[in-house]
Regions:
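Primarily membrane-embedded glycan-assembly and transfer machineries that use lipid-linked glycans
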Residues: 1-179, 201-334, 397-398, 425-430
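Aromatic-enriched
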Residues: 350-430
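Central hydrophobic cores of alpha-helical transmembrane segments
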Residues: 182-186, 212-219, 319-323, 359-371
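Hydrophobic alpha-helical transmembrane segments of integral membrane proteins
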Residues: 89, 143, 187, 193, ...
């Protein structure tokens, strides 16, 4: 219990409390301002809309006008964000609140409530009430995950989406309609997190869940596009440009040395670029590694014996491997690694049984680097010249130490696939 208390204090101090001190500018302000622009018939992806609809109860940053005029706002600051139009429909309840500060505090309160709901659901579906020691360990580990701390401090939409994703997975068997609606919301806000989950449900042939989810998503999309069409807003070109610029040279999504914050990314290209030194080769290598792991996952998935009543532990292992692999090929920031709650749950479940315990312990060791924002910390130490030049320029520092979180994800994916293979062998032999 003491471990949980310490982890909870760390979570509150490094998460919600930090957010309360950064209300003037954070990751949530741009999506809300863009939603206000959408509601008023303006282009939500146009930098000028940010200045026009910026909340009056907070100070507008000085860089907003200067970077907007110079055309570097997206490259330098990542705003306007390239969230899909469906996100504006879902964020409308916060955008219609006149006071930004009230909306922001309600947002962080809702995210905290969803996080707590996810913790309770983990205990219920994982039957941790019968294995309290493992349940306490899991609770402390989830509270200690640095991606959640970073996400809460920034007000990132990811910290709302990941608990929704977990609840959708937990309820997929017994509450298909609820799970489908939650999945649609996840895709509407962050497609790169929601689509792998929908793909998993499709492979499980949960057709009712799939159709309900796609129907809800279609309704949300129609509302979003119709509002833009009624006002004759030429949004599509700016949306495409925002996505292009976000991943372009020198942007916050750039995985090369042109982005001084690149080690805050966790996609595989950060690592492959350090190794090969060429953007095109890094992209090809990153996609190839993720593709190979994805094919291995599919092979093991279809080799898994079919069961009418799927075992929660095996389902958690399977979806854990899928989510870890999904983090590798495309743009993901550090807080998206909050998806590591899935392998954390499985690892704590695996500790109960001797045959799986080894894989579970190795998985916990590989998740350990994510209890601190290591890449960002090392990046700041290097930038502040706290790391000797001889060390900072050495191959082992650049290839192993700086991208250590990506190495951990790669190895974790391999361990989870190995655990899937071991489970399949055990089931087939019995």
């Amino acid at each position: 219990m003491m471990l949980i208390l310490l982890a909870a204090v760390e979570f509150i101090v490094r998460g919600p409390l930090r957010f309360s001190r950064s209300l003037d500018f954070n990751d949530f302000v741009s999506p809300v301002v863009q939603t206000r622009a959408w509601l008023n018939g303006a282009d939500p992806y146009e930098p000028a809309s940010l200045m026009q609809f910026w909340p009056s109860d907070i100070q507008r940053p000085d860089f907003l006008r200067s970077d907007s005029v110079s055309g570097t706002l997206i490259v330098k600051r990542g705003i306007p964000t390239a969230y899909p139009p469906t996100s504006f429909v879902l964020l409308t309840p916060f955008a219609v609140i006149p006071s930004w500060r009230v909306a922001a505090l309600l947002w962080i309160g809702l995210c905290t409530a969803m996080f707590a709901g996810m913790l309770f659901a983990m205990w219920r579906f994982g039957d941790f009430a019968s294995h309290t020691n493992h349940g306490y360990l899991l609770t402390a580990l989830v509270l200690g995950l640095a991606p959640f701390h970073t996400g809460f401090a920034a007000g990132s939409i990811a910290i709302f989406v990941v608990p929704l994703c977990a609840l959708a997975f937990f309820w997929a068997q017994n509450q298909e309609v609820v799970s489908a609606i939650l999945t649609a919301v996840v895709i509407g806000l962050k497609p790169q997190i929601g689509i792998p989950l929908l793909f998993y449900f499709g492979l499980r042939k949960q057709w009712k869940l799939i159709w309900v989810s796609l129907s809800v998503l279609a309704v949300i999309a129609v509302v979003a596009i119709t509002r833009l069409a009624i006002s004759h807003t030429p949004w599509l070109s700016n949306y495409a440009m925002d996505n292009t610029v976000l991943l372009g040279q020198g942007s916050l999504g750039d995985f090369t040395e042109l982005n001084p914050l690149r080690f805050g990314l966790i996609n595989c290209q950060v690592l492959t670029y350090v190794i090969f030194g060429k953007r095109c080769v890094a992209n090809l290598a990153g996609f190839s590694v993720a593709g190979f792991l994805g094919l291995a996952w599919l092979y093991l998935f279809f080799r898994t014996p079919v069961s009418r009543s799927p075992e929660f532990k095996m389902e958690t292992l399977t979806v854990s491997a899928l989510f870890v692999i999904s983090l590798l090929p495309v743009y993901h920031r550090f807080y998206d690694a909050s998806l590591l709650i899935f392998p954390l749950i499985w690892a704590c479940l695996a500790l109960r049984n001797f045959p799986e315990r080894r894989h579970g312990i190795i998985a916990l060791v590989l998740i350990a680097p994510f209890f601190i924002p290591g890449g960002t910390v090392l990046q700041q130490l290097t930038a502040n010249q706290r790391i000797p030049v001889s060390i900072g320029q050495s191959w082992w520092w650049r290839v192993i130490i700086m991208p250590h979180e990506i190495w951990a994800l790669l190895l974790l994916a391999v361990v989870l696939l190995s655990a899937m293979h071991a489970n399949i062998k055990m089931k087939l032999s019995s």
